[in-house]
Amino acid sequence: MGIGKSKMDPCHLSVPWGKSQSVDTSQSHHMSDSKQSEEISLHGDAVCSSTAEMPAEEQEGVEERPEEDTEEEVFLKFVILHAEEDTGEALRVQSLLENDFGIKPGIIFAEMPCGRQHLQNLDDAVNGSAWTILLLTENFLRDTWCKFQFYSSLMNSVNRQHKYNSVIPMRPLNNPLPRERTPFALRTINALEEESRGFPTQVERIFQESVYRIQQAIWKETRNTVQRQSVA
């Protein structure tokens, strides 16, 4: 997701334009055209030579600085799928996992890029993260799109071996969906219960770094394969 930037000649960037202009416009010294040209030429040579005498490390810093702005794709720890009305609650849960448990980076579905199809965002969210958290609230089952999200996530975890057990239903503190109203497909999975005393232990058992690393490696290899095929 990053865009590279073109390099520019540091000599051209370093020429003291203020001084060279004063030489051209000043009439008090009545300098000849040849003398002006010689002085400007020496000025430019001095700047370029001073740049050439810089240590290799500093020259690399000057030339490569634009590349530091290049953004790379990041494999997320988790994505939270939620009803539109639960965006605030999803943000709270995201902050809880990231700040209290150190599970980051994560994202909520509402923060996915705008201007793209929902299906593309859903695919990127589920396959671009190690765990998919379904925020089970009263609003979740009222939204047809949410139903599609959790069925798609479950099918993805079944069809892809490395995504097995990656879908995590979670009942938050605020407006949780009662167990008896939870779809059967989700009742077969142990849900995270935020109000439970064992919630911290549940979080530690589920979000293991070793599992994340395995999925991250598979994700990188898949992405590299796709890039090679597109170039070919």
Swiss-Prot record:
GO term, biological process aspect, one: phagocytosis
The protein's name is: TIR domain-containing adapter molecule 2
- Could you tell me where the Basic and acidic residues compositional bias lies? 1-10, 30-42
Modifications made to the protein after synthesis: Myristoylated. Required for membrane association which is critical for its ability to initiate efficient signaling. Phosphorylated by PRKCE in response to LPS. Phosphorylation is essential for its function. It is depleted from the membrane upon phosphorylation. Tyrosine phosphorylation is inhibited by phosphatase PTPN4.
Q: What is known of its domains?
A: The TIR domain mediates the interaction with TRAF6 and MYD88.
- Gene Ontology MF annotations: phospholipid binding; signaling adaptor activity
From what organism does this protein derive? Bos taurus
List all Acidic residues biased stretches: 55-71
Listed Pfam families: TIR_2
This protein's assembly is summarised as: Homodimer. Interacts with TLR4, TICAM1, IRF3 and IRF7 in response to LPS. Interacts with IL1R1, IL1RAP, IRAK2, IRAK3 and TRAF6. Interacts with protein kinase-inactive mutants of IRAK1 and IRAK4. Isoform 1 interacts with isoform 2; the interaction occurs in late endosomes and disrupts the interaction between isoform 1 and TICAM1. Interacts with MYD88; the interaction decreases after IL-18 stimulation in a time-dependent manner. Interacts with IL18R1 and IL18RAP. Interacts with TLR2. Interacts with RAB11FIP2.
List the transmembrane segments.
none
Q: Where in the cell is it found?
A: Cytoplasm; Golgi apparatus; Cell membrane; Endoplasmic reticulum
Phosphotyrosine sites (modified residues)? Y164
Q: Which InterPro entries does the record match to this protein?
A: TCAM1/2 (IPR046946), TIR_dom (IPR000157), Toll_tir_struct_dom_sf (IPR035897)
Q: Where is the TIR domain?
A: 70-226
Annotated coiled-coil segments of the chain: none
Question: Any keyword RNA-binding?
Answer: no
Q: Name one GO cellular component term.
A: late endosome
Give the keywords, sorted.
Answer: Cell membrane, Cell projection, Cytoplasm, Endoplasmic reticulum, Endosome, Golgi apparatus, Immunity, Inflammatory response, Innate immunity, Lipoprotein, Membrane, Myristate, Phosphoprotein
Q: What main location does UniProt list?
A: cytoplasm
